[in-house]
């Protein structure tokens, strides 16, 4: 199999090049690049960098990361081999994964602590609850589940391998203080 070309036919950098260029700077800011999407067919072409971190991605951070990414990519445009002048015009977007991204790794669960999620378990059952702490070994997560119509809660420990699907839910009202306490996270940290 032939090696992947360094540059896409559009003259834009490859996903790997963008990741290599930006990884260090984004990591210093506390964020990890989860995905890079290059759309050379769009007019103008689009480079989307999806980042996630332990802290929520706010607008100031997006602006700072975007400026940094733009500077890094502009340097490649000016000096990089094979990057064409046409490639210098592109839309750069730095974004978070979005609320609809399923939680699939231990770090996703850690970052979602305090958030409401809908889970599908390996036995086919479904649960809705609030993500609590991970066990020290990172193999299980606690889930704060509402019991009955009253505001009674229980904490269930679930092995991550027994969770088939987990998606963060959009909330329009803040959780109760008791529910947050059971996640082990103060209200301020949960973004309430």
From Swiss-Prot:
A GO BP annotation: translation
Alphabetical UniProt keywords: Cytoplasm, Ribosome biogenesis
InterPro entries to which the protein is assigned, alphabetical: Ribosome_maturation_RimP, RimP_C, RimP_N, RimP_N_sf
GO cellular component: cytosol
Compartments, record wording: Cytoplasm
Database matches in CDD domains: YlxS_C
The UniProt record lists the keyword Cytoplasm: yes
Location, primary (coarse class): cytoplasm
Entries under HAMAP family matching the protein: RimP (MF_01077)
Family: Belongs to the RimP family.
Described purpose of this protein according to its UniProt entry: Required for maturation of 30S ribosomal subunits.
Protein name: Ribosome maturation factor RimP
Organism from which the protein derives: Mycobacterium sp. (strain KMS)
Gene that encodes the chain: rimP
């Amino acid at each position: 199999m032939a090696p992947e070309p360094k540059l896409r036919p559009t003259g834009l950098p490859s996903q790997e090049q963008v990741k290599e260029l930006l990884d260090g700077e984004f990591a210093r800011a506390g964020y990890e690049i989860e995905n890079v999407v290059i759309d050379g067919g769009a007019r103008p072409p689009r480079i989307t960098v999806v980042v996630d971190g332990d802290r929520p991605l706010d607008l100031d951070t997006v602006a700072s990361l975007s400026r940094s990414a733009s500077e890094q990519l502009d340097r490649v445009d000016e000096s990089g081999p094979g990057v064409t002048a046409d490639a210098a015009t592109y839309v750069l977007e730095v974004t978070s994964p979005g609320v609809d991204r399923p939680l699939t790794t231990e770090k996703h669960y850690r970052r979602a602590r305090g958030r409401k999620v809908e889970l599908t378990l390996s036995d086919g059952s479904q649960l809705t609850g609030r993500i609590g702490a991970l066990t020290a070994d990172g193999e299980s997560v606690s889930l704060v589940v509402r019991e009955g119509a009253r505001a009674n809660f229980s904490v269930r420990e679930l092995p991550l391998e027994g969770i088939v699907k987990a998606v963060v839910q959009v909330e329009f009202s803040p959780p109760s203080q008791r529910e947050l306490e059971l996640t082990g996270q103060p209200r301020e940290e949960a973004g309430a």
